[in-house]
Amino acid sequence: MKTLLEMITIEMKEAFKAAGYDEELARVTLSNRPDLCEYQCNGAMAGAKKYKKAPIMIANEVVEELADSKYFASAEAVNPGFINLKLAPEVVAEYLNEMAADENLGVEKEKNPKKVIIDYGGPNVAKPLHVGHLRSAIIGESIKRIIRFKGNDVTGDIHLGDWGYQMGLIITELKKRKPELPYFDESFEGEYPEEAPFTISELEEIYPTASAYAKEHDDYREEALHATYLLQNGYKGYRAIWKHIMNVSVNDLKKNYERLSVDFDLWKGEADAQAYIPDMVEMLKEKGFAHYDEGALVVDVAEETDKKEIPPCMILKSDGAALYDTTDLATLVEREKLYDPDQVIYVVDKRQELHFVQVFRCAKKTGIVKPETELTFLGFGTMNGKDGKPFKTREGGVMRLENLIREIDDEMYKKIMDNRTVEEEDARRTAEEVGLAAIKYGDLSNQASKDYIFDVDRFTSFEGNTGPYILYTIVRIKSILKKYAENGGVLDGTIRPAENDAEKSLMLQVVKFNEVIDNVYKETAPHKLCAYIYDLANDFNKFYHETKILAEEDEEKKKGYLALLTLAKKVLETCIDLLGFTAPERM
């Protein structure tokens, strides 16, 4: 289904052509003066020089060609040459009824769907999730849903940090505490225990203890580095511990991400890429891409057009150890081999941009990925506290993600109980649903690349540009529709042409849905989806306050209102699903 903007652009092209002008001048945009008109066309201004004519003359001639157009209630040429367009209410109503009948609400799927991998989340195992993990998870999940909604084949990969020095630290600390475990007995020949020798709580305490101790004791650090080396070279006792660490950690991570409504298709990590490193290194050497520089193996990725220095991509350190560059390149080798993606999107902290510039250039230069494969860096800014510094606990430490979620849920629970519209048990469940919307909308309503301030008081408010306000609007619509059905009403009406400004504004906002989705998709910009649903919620609430919906005596008119509300609800629910949260039945 074409967007309404596309349809009226086609109509304008015909008018320009009929008036003797280039149809490419017929560029229609939303009006920047909605008090005067809904859409505008400035093509006459652009054509004045080419046709050596006053723009107002061109505009008048084009407007004459629109006299019989069914699309416009009025088309007016105004000085110095703008064309102001007001849509015919019948056309808007007809379009909305077509949207309502379409399972995709008028959104056209990709004609040539792409195979896309989104790399997001990226936590290290054996460490608790903290607020720094929030943005990658929330933004990545929303982008995954948006790209999938347009009909693409999308795979979300968490890409765990599961293979580095932290593993050696945990093994070394465990050996210090429990030397009697069979994993540390080189002569042990039996089966290793199926049950892990630690809980998630113990594991989360072991790592920081070991990390702090290693900074003060060189011998301990050396032992941890050696343990990392043994693990990476297949020592079976340490491989068995590593499997326990992975199982315990991943089970806990799954619970935490489930609470955030974040769902990964792949739970792969750095460890999965290790098998691809030797052949990749050999290929880079054989084909002359890699060379040694001060003992390290590197690939030059600088280009003549660079405005700043781009250092070489480091493949192996002088001691032969692999690095992040190596692992990320090997992961691309693996992805090419197993999934053959058209695009790989990395949703990571924007401070990692240089690293990904190096990796992307190296992957393209060396043929690790095909020339046409899109490698996209989507860098996000920092989530800050009210002081403008990275978000911390009151004591100044890094806040665990589960504690932040609990704090938001408690705040929502208090506000819901103050309203006393739901039972206590329902209030807890509702608080979790609304709390998640507060967190996700609070983040996603900001442009991903910008830093933003996480303000608990503002994000949990039922007023203003917040998640709770959006949900409150949806619940209000649900309540009206439910009340009508409970009184024996049947929702079988069709949307009628608007009769007042509030109704017209709401209809024109709903009409924009597919256009907004296309734009959000092209720009990978969830913040634009948030801006849209905030405007839509405002237009609905204005209509609600100015219109007697259920008290309307004309049954056909009432059914028309309810058909419009049903469509607005579907649009809002689709949008919040793309943002990664849901609305309760009551609030």
Where are these regions (language model features)?
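Short, charged, solvent-exposed linker or helix-capping segments at domain edges/interfaces
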Residues: 94-99
